[in-house]
UniProtKB/Swiss-Prot annotation:
Keyword Lipid metabolism appears in the UniProt entry: no
Pathway: Carbohydrate biosynthesis; D-glycero-D-manno-heptose 7-phosphate biosynthesis; D-glycero-alpha-D-manno-heptose 7-phosphate and D-glycero-beta-D-manno-heptose 7-phosphate from sedoheptulose 7-phosphate: step 1/1
Other remarks on this protein: The reaction produces a racemic mixture of D-glycero-alpha-D-manno-heptose 7-phosphate and D-glycero-beta-D-manno-heptose 7-phosphate.
Subcellular location: Cytoplasm
Reported cofactor(s): Zn(2+)
Species: Haemophilus influenzae (strain PittGG)
Descriptive protein name: Phosphoheptose isomerase
Pfam families: SIS_2 (PF13580)
Catalytic activity: 2 D-sedoheptulose 7-phosphate = D-glycero-alpha-D-manno-heptose 7-phosphate + D-glycero-beta-D-manno-heptose 7-phosphate
Disulfide pairings: none
GO-annotated biological processes: carbohydrate metabolic process; D-glycero-D-manno-heptose 7-phosphate biosynthetic process
Length: 194
C-alpha cells in the first residue's frame, strides 16, 4: 500500500545525509563546534540552547544530553534549554515572541558561554535576536541552519548548515544526527580533563 512511499522517504533522507557528508567543511565545522563547547565548559561556561517547534525540541534534547548523559556515565555539563513556559509566555505577552530567547540570554548569558541556536530556515527573528544579545554579552554562537542559511548566514562563530531546500524535516534529521555527534565529541574531549 505505502511501501514505495516509505522507501522513497528513506532514500531521500539518505541522499540529504550523503550530500551533507560529501562537503568536508561540514565535518570540520562539527569538530569546531564540539571544541568550542568543550572549551567553554573547561573555563566555567555554559550552553544556552534555543529553537522553534521541532528545533525547540532538538534544543531541549541537546541540553538534556549535556546535563544528563549521552553514552557515558560522567558528570553533567552546564546547559540550559530556553524552554521555561512561564518565561516564554511572559516575554511573548509583554514584549513579543521575537524576544523570548534574547531576553533570557540578556538575563543569564555571560562572556564565555555558548549560544546554540537552531533554525531550519535561518530566518527566525527570535533566534536572530538571541544571537545579537549573545554577541553583546561576549558569548560564542553556534548556529544550526538549513537551506542557504537565511539571515543567520555568517552571523555565528560556527554555522552548521544543511543545504536542503524542500521540507524542514530533512534538515531536522541531520540536525539531530549532528547533535548526537557533538555529544560524543564533547564527552571524548571532556574525559581528557577528568
Amino acid at each position: 500500500m505505502y511501501l514505495d512511499q516509505i522507501k522513497a522517504e528513506l532514500v531521500e533522507a539518505q541522499d540529504v545525509l550523503n550530500k551533507f557528508i560529501s562537503d568536508e567543511n561540514n565535518i570540520k565545522l562539527i569538530q569546531e563546534a564540539a571544541l568550542l563547547i568543550s572549551n567553554s565548559f573547561k573555563q566555567g561556561g555554559k550552553v544556552l540552547s534555543c529553537g522553534n517547534g521541532g528545533s525547540h525540541c532538538d534544543a531541549m534534547h541537546f541540553a538534556e544530553e549535556l546535563t544528563g548523559r549521552y553514552r557515558e556515565n560522567r558528570p553533567g555539563y552546564p546547559a540550559i534549554a530556553i524552554s521555561d513556559a512561564s518565561h516564554l509566555s511572559c516575554v511573548s505577552n509583554d514584549f513579543g515572541y521575537e524576544y523570548v530567547f534574547s531576553r533570557y540570554v540578556e538575563a543569564v548569558g555571560q562572556k564565555g558561554d555558548v549560544l546554540f541556536g537552531l533554525s531550519t530556515s535561518g530566518n527566525s527573528k527570535n533566534i536572530l535576536n538571541a544571537i545579537e544579545a549573545a554577541k553583546a554579552k561576549g558569548m560564542k554562537v553556534i548556529a544550526m541552519t538549513g537551506k542557504d542559511g537565511g539571515k543567520m548566514a555568517g552571523l555565528a562563530d560556527v554555522e552548521i548548515r544543511v543545504p536542503h531546500f524542500r521540507y524542514a524535516d530533512r534538515i531536522q534529521e541531520i540536525h539531530i544526527k549532528v547533535i548526537h555527534i557533538l555529544m560524543m565529541l564533547i564527552e571524548f574531549e571532556m574525559a581528557k580533563q577528568a
